[in-house]
Swiss-Prot record:
UniProt GO molecular function: clathrin adaptor activity
Pfam families with a match to the protein in the record: Clat_adaptor_s
SUPFAM superfamilies, alphabetized: SNARE-like
Protein name: AP-1 complex subunit sigma-2
Family: Belongs to the adaptor complexes small subunit family.
Gene, per the UniProt record: ap1s2
Lineage summary: Eukaryota, Amoebozoa, Evosea, Eumycetozoa, Dictyostelia
Assigned GO CC terms: AP-1 adaptor complex; intracellular membrane-bounded organelle
Length: 154
């Protein structure tokens, strides 16, 4: 299973987070974000969360005011992708304490760090929430210590 990209969109259509795992031009990225945003935001809530789009499959889930959107290959399992999205949201919730859109706006670098610990090159790398949270906590501790205070255990 390979993700081509992941988008977090607000209900107003603003992009809050993007991660591209396949090579696309900036023009394509902009067009894809706009097209997919329109498809997802205008879709009635009673319909399913899977869309066929070009040679890909779009899988999305709404949590509060944010849409988590993943583009993957057509042969990938939709339910596993939904579980990965839910896994990411659970980690964000534990880290931020009931994550909201403002958390992602003001702490986008931490959201990207969490995503990078979870998914690498479009593939799920870490399934343990505790491991991801421990690594993020270590990163926070490292960043909070001032210059010259970093300890490296060998």
């Amino acid at each position: 299973m390979t993700f081509h990209f992941l988008l977090l969109l607000s209900r107003q259509g603003k992009t809050r987070l993007t991660k591209w795992y396949s090579p696309f031009t900036n023009k394509e990225k902009s067009r894809f974000t706009r097209e997919i945003g329109n498809m997802v935001l205008n879709r009635p809530p009673k319909l399913c969360n899977f869309l066929e789009w070009k040679e890909y499959k779009i899988i999305f889930k709404r949590y509060a005011s944010l849409y988590f959107v993943v583009c993957c290959d057509r042969e990938d399992n939709e339910l596993i992708v939904l579980e990965i999205i839910h896994h990411f949201v659970e980690i964000l919730d534990r880290y931020f304490g009931n994550v909201c859109e403002l958390d992602l706006i003001f702490n986008f670098h931490k959201a990207y760090y969490i995503l990078d610990e979870l998914i690498m090159a479009g593939e799920l790398q870490e399934t343990s929430k505790k491991t991801v949270l421990r690594l993020i906590s270590q990163q926070d501790t490292l960043l909070e210590g001032g210059p010259g205070e970093h300890k490296v255990d060998l």
